[in-house]
């Protein structure tokens, strides 16, 4: 199972944006919002997670363009980061969604020096972690696509995004 998440020393927060909803997964499904697969009843952990709140940025077609589910280190035993706060992240599959993630990171970096993006395969032990660092002003949608597309099972990947 692949797992993607963000890590920070500052809690992941909603920004004042009328298009960002903080909503329970089951309420989003009931409202007919078009959600990422991991938020739908067909996903294996939906029944367990349906009452959890998620943050969604909704576009003009009622599609969820960006989804974040926040949690703290105590709630996650597989995190490789030393940061205190985490948010589950699902791959952003279009340039528009990648740009939305970049803007979210830019906003979050107003409150902290860096955010880590992680991509790993749950299960095996790893000897090393592939690491890269990028300044937020230099981060492009293509960088995110490459980060996620070039993943292998051999080692987790971490991209540290800095101010």
Go through the PLM ranges and name each one.
Residues 1-163:
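Structured alpha/beta or helical-core interaction and ligand-binding surfaces enriched in interleaved
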């Amino acid at each position: 199972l692949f797992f993607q998440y963000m890590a920070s020393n500052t809690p992941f927060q909603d920004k004042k944006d009328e298009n960002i909803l903080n909503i329970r997964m089951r309420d989003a499904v009931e409202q007919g919002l078009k959600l990422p697969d991991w938020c739908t009843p067909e996903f294996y952990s939906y029944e367990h997670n349906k009452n959890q709140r998620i943050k969604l940025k909704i576009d003009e077609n009622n599609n969820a363009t960006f989804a974040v589910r926040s949690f703290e280190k105590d709630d996650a035993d597989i995190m490789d980061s030393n940061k205190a706060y985490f948010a589950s992240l699902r791959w952003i599959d279009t340039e528009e969604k990648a740009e939305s993630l970049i803007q979210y990171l830019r906003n979050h970096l107003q409150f902290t020096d860096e955010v880590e993006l992680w991509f790993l395969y749950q299960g095996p032990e790893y000897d090393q972690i592939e690491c890269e660092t990028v300044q937020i002003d230099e981060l492009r949608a293509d960088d995110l696509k490459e980060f996620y597309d070039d993943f292998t099972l051999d080692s987790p990947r971490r991209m540290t995004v800095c101010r």
